[in-house]
Amino acid sequence: MPELPEVETVVLSIRDQLVGQNFININVRWPKVLFNFSKQDFLDNLVRRNITNVHRRAKFIVLSFDEDILAIHLRMTGKLYFADGKTNGKHISASMELDNGQQLVFEDTRKFGRFYYYTSQDFLDKKLGIEPLGDSFTADWLIENLRCKKRMIKALLLDQRIIAGLGNIYAVSYTHLRAHETLRYRVF
């Protein structure tokens, strides 16, 4: 399952090739990949619009089009990459044609990955907590914001409304290393 560092790696690998480009079409092979919008919505709202930024928010790959965003979540087996040629793999959920001739492909063996369309990033920001790689995420912040919680430490670390982007592998590693898995967080 792609965790926050893997998602960041994907963002870094596609950003330079996407910023400044425009989608000209989308080929949807697995309709459920488009979670809260349709292919027609994509064509109406995102085609021929300049991609102004590509960044990560939690485990989402966010493509910005001025105010609108396309947020892509890889889930367990999703992969986002530029195709070298014709795309006909049986696990391809969607492919998007760019005005420079490239194809951005979303491949997902288990079919859990999703695309979300929002008219602003505010929706994601309201739904998700602090970024663990951001400057605001400090030991003081952690103590202050988790001090009075009466939940298991692993559950707190996995709660995306508190800390955005941490996954099971990091929560388990932390609790194992610290031997806190069975302790309540009131130890602060």
Which ranges hold each PLM region?
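Single conserved hydrophobic/aromatic residue that forms the stacking wall/gate
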Residues: 176, 181-188
